Protein backbone atom coordinates (compact mmCIF):
# COMPACT_ATOMS: atom_id res chain seq x y z
CA UNK A 1 0.00 0.00 0.00
CA UNK A 2 2.68 2.52 0.97
CA UNK A 3 4.73 1.78 -2.16
CA UNK A 4 2.12 3.59 -4.23
CA UNK A 5 0.56 5.84 -1.57
CA UNK A 6 3.18 7.06 0.96
CA UNK A 7 0.51 8.95 2.91
CA UNK A 8 -0.60 5.59 4.33
CA UNK A 9 2.75 5.05 6.07
CA UNK A 10 1.35 6.09 9.46
CA UNK A 11 -1.71 3.87 8.99
CA UNK A 12 0.45 0.88 8.03
CA UNK A 13 2.70 1.48 11.03
CA UNK A 14 -0.24 1.53 13.43
CA UNK A 15 -1.71 -1.65 11.99
CA UNK A 16 1.59 -3.54 12.18
CA UNK A 17 2.19 -2.40 15.75
CA UNK A 18 -1.24 -3.75 16.70
CA UNK A 19 -0.32 -7.07 15.05
CA UNK A 20 2.89 -7.14 17.10
CA UNK A 21 0.85 -7.51 20.29
CA UNK A 22 0.75 -11.20 19.34
CA UNK A 23 4.33 -12.41 19.81
CA UNK A 24 3.78 -15.25 17.33
CA UNK A 25 3.69 -12.59 14.59
CA UNK A 26 7.12 -11.14 15.41
CA UNK A 27 9.19 -13.31 13.08
CA UNK A 28 6.82 -12.73 10.16
CA UNK A 29 6.74 -8.96 10.75
CA UNK A 30 10.53 -8.76 11.08
CA UNK A 31 11.30 -10.77 7.95
CA UNK A 32 8.60 -9.10 5.84
CA UNK A 33 9.61 -5.56 6.76
CA UNK A 34 13.32 -6.27 6.27
CA UNK A 35 12.61 -7.59 2.79
CA UNK A 36 10.41 -4.59 2.01
CA UNK A 37 13.17 -2.10 2.89
CA UNK A 38 15.07 -3.25 -0.20
CA UNK A 39 12.19 -2.07 -2.39
CA UNK A 40 11.19 0.98 -0.33
CA UNK A 41 13.63 2.40 2.28
CA UNK A 42 10.79 4.35 3.91
CA UNK A 43 9.66 1.03 5.44
CA UNK A 44 12.59 1.39 7.84
CA UNK A 45 10.49 3.82 9.88
CA UNK A 46 7.92 1.03 10.41
CA UNK A 47 10.67 -1.45 11.23
CA UNK A 48 12.23 0.92 13.77
CA UNK A 49 8.83 1.42 15.43
CA UNK A 50 8.32 -2.35 15.57
CA UNK A 51 11.74 -2.89 17.16
CA UNK A 52 11.11 -0.11 19.66
CA UNK A 53 7.71 -1.42 20.72
CA UNK A 54 9.04 -4.95 21.19
CA UNK A 55 11.95 -3.74 23.33
CA UNK A 56 14.65 -4.30 20.71
CA UNK A 57 16.09 -0.86 21.29
CA UNK A 58 19.52 -1.44 19.74
CA UNK A 59 17.93 -2.67 16.52
CA UNK A 60 15.63 0.36 16.52
CA UNK A 61 18.71 2.56 16.93
CA UNK A 62 20.38 0.88 13.94
CA UNK A 63 17.31 1.52 11.78
CA UNK A 64 17.22 5.19 12.72
CA UNK A 65 20.89 5.51 11.74
CA UNK A 66 20.15 3.93 8.37
CA UNK A 67 17.30 6.39 7.81
CA UNK A 68 19.73 9.23 8.49
CA UNK A 69 19.34 12.90 9.38
CA UNK A 70 18.63 14.69 6.12
CA UNK A 71 15.98 17.30 6.92
CA UNK A 72 14.09 18.94 9.78
CA UNK A 73 11.60 16.08 9.89
CA UNK A 74 14.49 13.68 10.48
CA UNK A 75 15.82 15.98 13.20
CA UNK A 76 12.48 15.88 15.01
CA UNK A 77 12.25 12.10 14.58
CA UNK A 78 15.74 11.56 15.98
CA UNK A 79 15.25 13.81 19.00
CA UNK A 80 11.91 12.12 19.75
CA UNK A 81 13.61 8.71 19.56
CA UNK A 82 16.43 9.79 21.91
CA UNK A 83 13.93 11.33 24.35
CA UNK A 84 11.80 8.18 24.34
CA UNK A 85 14.83 6.00 25.03
CA UNK A 86 15.56 8.12 28.08
CA UNK A 87 11.96 7.77 29.29
CA UNK A 88 12.32 3.99 28.91
CA UNK A 89 15.35 4.16 31.24
CA UNK A 90 17.62 3.18 28.35
CA UNK A 91 20.00 5.88 29.47
CA UNK A 92 23.25 4.62 27.93
CA UNK A 93 21.60 4.12 24.55
CA UNK A 94 19.81 7.45 24.90
CA UNK A 95 23.14 9.19 25.52
CA UNK A 96 24.58 7.45 22.46
CA UNK A 97 21.60 8.63 20.40
CA UNK A 98 22.05 12.25 21.50
CA UNK A 99 25.76 12.08 20.69
CA UNK A 100 25.06 10.57 17.28
CA UNK A 101 22.62 13.37 16.57
CA UNK A 102 25.09 16.08 17.61
CA UNK A 103 27.85 14.54 15.49
CA UNK A 104 25.77 13.98 12.35
CA UNK A 105 23.08 16.66 12.12
CA UNK A 106 23.72 19.45 9.61
CA UNK A 107 21.00 21.82 10.77
CA UNK A 108 22.59 24.18 13.34
CA UNK A 109 19.29 25.27 14.86
CA UNK A 110 19.84 26.54 18.43
CA UNK A 111 16.55 24.99 19.53
CA UNK A 112 17.62 21.56 18.23
CA UNK A 113 21.01 21.79 19.93
CA UNK A 114 19.40 23.02 23.12
CA UNK A 115 16.94 20.13 23.19
CA UNK A 116 19.71 17.59 22.55
CA UNK A 117 21.91 19.02 25.29
CA UNK A 118 18.98 19.19 27.67
CA UNK A 119 18.20 15.55 26.93
CA UNK A 120 21.81 14.64 27.66
CA UNK A 121 21.64 16.44 30.98
CA UNK A 122 18.48 14.57 31.93
CA UNK A 123 19.99 11.23 30.90
CA UNK A 124 23.04 11.92 33.05
CA UNK A 125 20.77 12.92 35.92
CA UNK A 126 18.87 9.65 35.54
CA UNK A 127 22.18 7.83 35.92
CA UNK A 128 22.91 9.83 39.05
CA UNK A 129 19.57 8.81 40.56
CA UNK A 130 19.90 5.14 39.59
CA UNK A 131 23.58 4.59 40.38
CA UNK A 132 25.20 6.86 42.91
CA UNK A 133 28.81 5.79 42.38
CA UNK A 134 29.29 3.78 39.18
CA UNK A 135 28.35 6.09 36.32
CA UNK A 136 29.00 5.52 32.64
CA UNK A 137 29.63 8.58 30.51
CA UNK A 138 29.91 8.42 26.75
CA UNK A 139 32.71 10.53 25.27
CA UNK A 140 31.75 12.91 22.48
CA UNK A 141 34.83 14.26 20.69
CA UNK A 142 36.96 13.96 23.88
CA UNK A 143 39.94 15.71 22.26
CA UNK A 144 38.17 18.74 20.87
CA UNK A 145 40.23 21.57 19.45
CA UNK A 146 37.49 23.24 17.41
CA UNK A 147 36.59 25.88 19.97
CA UNK A 148 38.98 28.45 21.37
CA UNK A 149 40.09 27.92 24.95
CA UNK A 150 38.58 31.18 26.16
CA UNK A 151 35.11 29.64 25.81
CA UNK A 152 35.79 27.05 28.49
CA UNK A 153 37.44 26.63 31.86
CA UNK A 154 39.34 23.40 32.60
CA UNK A 155 37.98 21.28 35.42
CA UNK A 156 40.39 20.20 38.13
CA UNK A 157 39.41 16.51 38.22
CA UNK A 158 41.07 13.24 37.33
CA UNK A 159 38.29 11.89 35.09
CA UNK A 160 39.58 13.35 31.83
CA UNK A 161 36.85 11.98 29.49
CA UNK A 162 34.12 13.42 31.69
CA UNK A 163 35.96 16.72 32.06
CA UNK A 164 36.42 17.03 28.31
CA UNK A 165 32.75 16.22 27.73
CA UNK A 166 31.63 18.94 30.13
CA UNK A 167 34.07 21.41 28.58
CA UNK A 168 32.67 20.64 25.15
CA UNK A 169 29.12 21.22 26.33
CA UNK A 170 30.16 24.56 27.80
CA UNK A 171 31.85 25.58 24.56
CA UNK A 172 28.67 24.84 22.59
CA UNK A 173 26.54 26.74 25.08
CA UNK A 174 28.92 29.69 24.79
CA UNK A 175 28.10 29.90 21.09
CA UNK A 176 24.35 29.46 21.43
CA UNK A 177 22.01 32.42 21.97
CA UNK A 178 20.44 32.60 25.41
CA UNK A 179 17.08 30.87 25.60
CA UNK A 180 14.93 28.93 28.05
CA UNK A 181 16.44 25.67 26.75
CA UNK A 182 20.03 26.81 27.25
CA UNK A 183 19.09 27.98 30.74
CA UNK A 184 17.93 24.48 31.64
CA UNK A 185 21.10 23.01 30.11
CA UNK A 186 23.27 25.29 32.24
CA UNK A 187 21.21 24.29 35.30
CA UNK A 188 21.60 20.57 34.55
CA UNK A 189 25.32 20.96 33.98
CA UNK A 190 25.58 22.74 37.32
CA UNK A 191 23.88 19.79 38.99
CA UNK A 192 26.31 17.35 37.36
CA UNK A 193 29.28 19.45 38.47
CA UNK A 194 27.96 19.67 42.02
CA UNK A 195 26.62 16.14 42.47
CA UNK A 196 29.25 14.14 40.62
CA UNK A 197 32.40 16.25 40.52
CA UNK A 198 31.85 18.16 43.76
CA UNK A 199 33.09 21.17 41.80
CA UNK A 200 30.99 23.73 43.65
CA UNK A 201 32.71 26.80 42.18
CA UNK A 202 32.22 25.50 38.64
CA UNK A 203 28.63 24.56 39.44
CA UNK A 204 27.97 28.07 40.72
CA UNK A 205 29.27 29.44 37.43
CA UNK A 206 26.81 27.22 35.54
CA UNK A 207 23.90 28.25 37.77
CA UNK A 208 24.70 31.94 37.25
CA UNK A 209 24.86 31.35 33.49
CA UNK A 210 21.43 29.74 33.73
CA UNK A 211 20.06 32.92 35.32
CA UNK A 212 21.18 34.88 32.26
CA UNK A 213 19.36 32.55 29.86
CA UNK A 214 15.77 33.71 30.23
CA UNK A 215 14.54 31.05 32.71
CA UNK A 216 10.97 31.00 33.99
CA UNK A 217 10.18 31.88 37.60
CA UNK A 218 10.12 28.28 38.78
CA UNK A 219 13.62 27.67 37.43
CA UNK A 220 14.83 31.00 38.83
CA UNK A 221 13.74 29.88 42.30
CA UNK A 222 15.61 26.58 41.95
CA UNK A 223 18.73 28.32 40.66
CA UNK A 224 18.76 30.84 43.50
CA UNK A 225 18.59 28.02 46.05
CA UNK A 226 21.43 26.18 44.31
CA UNK A 227 23.65 29.28 44.18
CA UNK A 228 23.31 29.74 47.93
CA UNK A 229 24.10 26.08 48.56
CA UNK A 230 27.19 26.22 46.33
CA UNK A 231 28.54 29.23 48.21
CA UNK A 232 28.21 27.34 51.48
CA UNK A 233 29.67 24.09 50.13
CA UNK A 234 32.65 25.91 48.58
CA UNK A 235 33.45 27.55 51.93
CA UNK A 236 32.58 31.09 50.83
CA UNK A 237 30.83 31.86 54.10
CA UNK A 238 31.12 35.65 54.01
CA UNK A 239 29.79 35.74 50.46
CA UNK A 240 26.99 33.34 51.35
CA UNK A 241 26.04 35.53 54.32
CA UNK A 242 25.71 38.51 52.00
CA UNK A 243 23.78 36.38 49.52
CA UNK A 244 21.20 35.24 52.07
CA UNK A 245 20.96 38.60 53.88
CA UNK A 246 17.90 40.54 52.59
CA UNK A 247 18.44 43.98 51.13
CA UNK A 248 17.59 46.82 53.51
CA UNK A 249 15.05 48.34 51.13
CA UNK A 250 13.03 45.11 50.86
CA UNK A 251 10.00 44.80 53.10
CA UNK A 252 10.37 41.55 55.02
CA UNK A 253 7.18 39.87 56.22
CA UNK A 254 5.82 36.41 56.89
CA UNK A 255 5.52 35.79 53.12
CA UNK A 256 9.15 36.66 52.33
Predicted features and spans:
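Acidic, polar-rich low-complexity tracts and alpha-helical solenoid repeat scaffolds
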Residues: 1-256
Amino acid sequence: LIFNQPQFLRYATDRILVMSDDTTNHFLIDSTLNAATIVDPSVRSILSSFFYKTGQFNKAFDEHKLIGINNQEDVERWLLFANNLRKEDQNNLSIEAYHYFLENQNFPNPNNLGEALLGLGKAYENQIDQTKTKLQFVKWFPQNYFFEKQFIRPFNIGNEPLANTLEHYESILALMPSSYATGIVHYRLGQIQARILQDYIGANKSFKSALKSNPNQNLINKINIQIGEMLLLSGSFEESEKYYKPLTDINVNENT
